[in-house]
A protein has these predicted regions:
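Active-site recognition of the HExxH zinc-binding catalytic motif
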Residues: 146-160
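Active-site-proximal beta-strand/loop segments in catalytic clefts of secreted hydrolases
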Residues: 30-32, 106-111, 132-133, 158, ...
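Metzincin-family zinc-dependent endopeptidase catalytic domain
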Residues: 38, 42-149
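Metalloprotease/metallohydrolase-associated module, dominated by Zn2+-dependent proteases
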Residues: 119-120, 124-138, 142-143, 159-201
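Bacterial Sec-dependent signal peptides at the C-terminal "C-region" and cleavage site
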Residues: 4-26
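Acidic/histidine-rich, surface-exposed loop or edge segments in extracytoplasmic proteins
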Residues: 21-35, 130-132
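Intrinsically disordered, low-complexity proline-rich regions
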Residues: 1, 11-13, 41, 184-188
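Residues at or immediately flanking beta-strands
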Residues: 24-26, 56-60, 165-167, 198
Length: 201
């Protein structure tokens, strides 16, 4: 069962014991309740919280909630194309900035390149736009959790690297989401430099 609306206690136990409560980014997922990507979002958030805790970062992600609010696929595609081509980003509708949370995960209904954007670029929140899972590459085993984690990495400020064995590999390198395919459930790792960057969050 998905753990929406309840923050895992483990996110807060260590900081409380050390006297420093973590900052939290509440996550709002925009998509239908039966979307298969919801489970992968939860797994990706758990992955990032493990990474953030391991480097003693003061940031955690969660809790996770879901909204039936939708964003037009045409706008999502325009944002994706603008990121890929270095063009000016079109803003999201103002109503989306009024949604609760600090990070929006938008589950698109069509196919384009998924993207992750730091807070303030298209909305008040950080935004991860995730392509449809109706077909490859997201329908391939182990891809969805890693692709979503990859885009959340961009929301956290990480950039692409060129190592195909690493989570954040991407353009202009030839890494593509299908490389995450595996019969074993696992997340691809971060580089030492990326872990150091997380420590400053």
């Amino acid at each position: 069962m998905l753990r929406f609306a309840a923050a895992p206690l483990l996110l807060f136990i260590l900081p409380v014991l050390t006297g420093a409560a973590p900052r939290t980014w509440a996550v709002t997922v925009l998509g239908p309740a039966d979307d298969p990507r919801l489970a992968a979002v939860t797994e990706a958030v758990d992955f990032w919280n493990e990474q953030l805790e391991s480097v003693n970062s003061g940031l955690r992600l969660g809790p996770i909630s879901r909204s039936d609010e939708r964003v037009a696929d045409d706008l999502l595609r325009t944002v994706s194309d603008a990121v890929l081509n270095g063009r000016r980003l079109p803003p999201f509708p103002p109503r989306l900035s009024d949604l609760p949370g600090d990070l929006l995960v938008v589950l698109a209904g069509t196919h384009f390149i998924s993207v992750g954007l730091t807070p303030g670029r298209v909305a008040r929140q950080g935004v991860a736009i995730i392509r449809s899972a109706d077909g490859p590459p997201l329908s391939l085993p182990n891809v969805a959790r890693n692709l979503i984690a990859h885009e959340l990495g961009h929301v956290l400020g990480l950039r692409h690297n060129s190592d195909p064995a690493m989570l954040m590999c991407g353009r202009p390198a030839t890494c593509r989401p299908a490389l995450f395919q595996s019969d074993t459930k696992r997340f691809f790792p971060l580089t030492d430099a990326e872990r150091q960057a997380l420590a400053g969050r």
